[in-house]
């Protein structure tokens, strides 16, 4: 069973027991269950259900595994012939979730 859902303005593809990295969910602790109701698409053994825009009775249950930081993204600027160099780094906060079940 596969599903496409929307969370925090982004769309994700999920299947049972998948681990997915999403932007940080503030206020949720490790081990807590979350319920996702904005499901766009479900595919189950040849049966395809498409929402307009969302599936009304669909729920995805996921468990928060941990909060982590992504690898460093480097932004480097320079100007030719001036000797100007600027190096900045950024690490995005992420939440790792595990899909427990998909119901429709």
Curated annotation (Swiss-Prot):
Function as written in the Swiss-Prot or TrEMBL entry: This protein binds to 23S rRNA in the presence of protein L20.
Protein family (similarity comment): Belongs to the bacterial ribosomal protein bL21 family.
Subunit structure: Part of the 50S ribosomal subunit. Contacts protein L20.
Gene Ontology molecular-function annotations: rRNA binding; structural constituent of ribosome
SUPFAM superfamilies: L21p-like (SSF141091)
Short name of one Pfam family: Ribosomal_L21p
NCBIfam families on file: L21
One of the protein's GO biological processes: translation
Gene Ontology cellular component list: cytoplasm; ribonucleoprotein complex; ribosome
Protein name per the record: Large ribosomal subunit protein bL21
Keywords recorded for this protein, A-Z: Ribonucleoprotein, Ribosomal protein, RNA-binding, rRNA-binding
């Amino acid at each position: 069973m596969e599903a496409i859902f929307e969370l925090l303005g982004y769309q994700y593809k999920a299947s049972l027991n998948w681990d997915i990295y999403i932007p940080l969910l503030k206020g949720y602790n490790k081990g807590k269950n979350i319920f996702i109701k904005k499901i766009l698409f479900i595919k189950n053994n040849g049966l395809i259900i498409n929402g307009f825009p969302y599936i009304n009775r669909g729920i995805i249950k996921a468990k928060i595994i941990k909060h982590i930081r992504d690898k460093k993204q480097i932004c480097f600027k320079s100007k030719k012939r001036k000797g100007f160099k600027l190096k900045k780094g950024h690490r995005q906060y992420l939440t790792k979730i595990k899909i427990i079940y998909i119901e429709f």
